[in-house]
Amino acid sequence: MAKVYEFLANGFEEVEALAPVDILRRGGIEVKMVSVTGSNLVESSHGVVVKADLLFENITDFSDADLLMLPGGMPGSKNLNEHEGVRKALKEQFEKGKRVAAICAAPLVLASVGLLKGKKATIYPGMESYLGEDAEYTGALVQEDGNVTTGAGPAASFPY
């Protein structure tokens, strides 16, 4: 069975975090929401508190993952970007040729780790500069390029 980990930091966007988890779980895919806050309770950018399945610090590695996923939102995306463990896990996943995905503002994390070099990508409108010069911004609602999927914002939560 496919396995997905979604990283949650305080300030995440609710729809971008929960819609993909709900859809994937309904499809029979094992999805684990992983808190990077040190607590299972993670607060969204609009004050909604979600209980994550796992704590990042209790996981030794993510080698069993088929996909690592990042929801957007602010300051959630910046908080994910500041978490060295998340950055390392994404890089290792990408280097193994496995899938990574980020939506809304969260593609900035993929870009800062260097995973968007030479890739087509999208991001929340107005944040294009966060993709850096190495990515090709497409403006698409959802963009796939190899093992990387990016989404432009809340409206992309379902097709993403």
Language model segments and positions:
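Active-site-adjacent pocket-lining segments in enzyme domains
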Residues: 3-6, 12, 23-39, 53-160
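A cross-family phosphate/adenosyl-ligand binding-site feature
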Residues: 44-53
